[in-house]
Amino acid sequence: MKRNSRRWIMGALVIGLAVVFLAGPAAAQVKIRFQTWHWGEKPWVTALDAFKDDFNKANPGIEVVRDESRYADKETVYTATSQAKAAADIAHFQHRPIPMFAERGYLLPLDSFIEKEGGQKFLAQYDQAALEVCKYKGKIYCLPDFVNPMGMLINMAHYKEVGLDPTKPPATWDQLVEYAKKLTTGSRYGIGLIGARQEGLFMRLNPFVWGAGGEYLTADGKRSAMDTPEFLEGFKFYVELFTKHKVVPPGVIEQGAQEVRTQLAHEKISMNISVPQAWKIVQAINPNMKVPETLTAVPVPVGPKKKVTAAEYGMRVISASTKNPEAAWKVYKYWYGHDIQLRNFQIAAVLSARLDVKNGPEMQNDKYAKIYSAQAPFAKLEPRIPEWPKIGDAVITAVQEAFSGQKTPEQALKDAHASANRTLSGQ
């Protein structure tokens, strides 16, 4: 009896150990860090949480976990963590740093995964112009998430208060100044601008630089072209909205994209050059504002030389140092699926680069999306070179110096031009 009991105990122990062993993989679940600055931003966080919860429920062996970044210094932090081989498995950036990160070996090429998914047939699902931005030296380092041309939000009630017709928004730079002056009254200002050290500044500055005929680089891409009269004209126009025309709120150097949207949400400004999703963010900032009845979207005013606007291309990348590339790709592919991309538009109003969403009825019939999408043929990007982040940083310094009066626009731009040439020459 004792022997049988002993055998039973030993058998139970073996079975118990087997259960523990078999349960091991669940306990050692693969965690994929999904990094973006939008985890702390409404309404984006709603879409992100829904994605995370849906994926985790459908894939018990993999867990998507939040990894928060900050918009202003995301590139700097990613560089440091990549050098330490501790970067998030999947990270979110706009288009500007992709060549630099690829050149430095921080990003995992996606070509082998794409081939397994069908190669060119798989890639044909996405906006092809945006897809080109993901390519560097013959390899693909990302898929385009969203393609957001810039437009301008205007407060229709403010227009009517000062005798302006919101159905006839400013079409030229001169009209923009005229309207902004009329809209600047009491504690309210005509337009909000970004002066903070963040890449959102370029999406507001660039339409003026390019609209005047300016370019960042010479045609061969080897030298700065910021010493041209055209570049200076656009640069000065942007700066003088604050320094000369006084139609921008105080503290412009501290104002980033979210701060300016907050000004719009609380009716401290009447106009804001913005991304397509800005109206949703404004609604989240001030739920009491009836945004669809208050704000409408219009094109950015046309410059003296050409009609042009900037764009925000959203990209997700997989780190070259991920310890779980197959699991990371599974999460990555899920994010780019039709249902997730459509829900992202429904919640956050970003314009998906996935063609079956972009050309679908919801985006095609949305009043804001229609106006922003119509700006796509006029959208332009900064030079796609590894040196751009450093050149861009010098441009932001110049804008801040000119805004503050520390330097004249001419001197600030001259110094940025010299800095860009040093960068391009490898110094």
Task: Walk through the language-model features, giving the residues of each.
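Short, solvent-exposed loop/beta-turn-alpha elements that line the ligand-binding surface or hinge
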Residues: 111-126, 169, 195, 212-233, ...
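Extracytoplasmic/periplasmic solute-binding protein
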Residues: 136-145, 150, 174-224, 269
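Hinge/lid segment of periplasmic solute-binding proteins
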Residues: 70, 95-151, 177, 201-204, ...
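Extracytoplasmic/periplasmic substrate-binding proteins
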Residues: 37, 56, 203-207, 212, ...
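Extracytoplasmic "Venus flytrap"/periplasmic binding protein-like
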Residues: 33, 50-129, 135, 160-165, ...
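Glycine-centered hinge/linker elements that transmit conformational signals in sensory
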Residues: 177-184, 220-252
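Conserved C-terminal helix/tail region of periplasmic/extracytoplasmic solute-binding proteins
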Residues: 63, 160-161, 166, 243-246, ...
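Long, aromatic- and glycine/proline-rich binding clefts that accommodate carbohydrate-like moieties
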Residues: 125-126, 295-299, 345-397, 401, ...
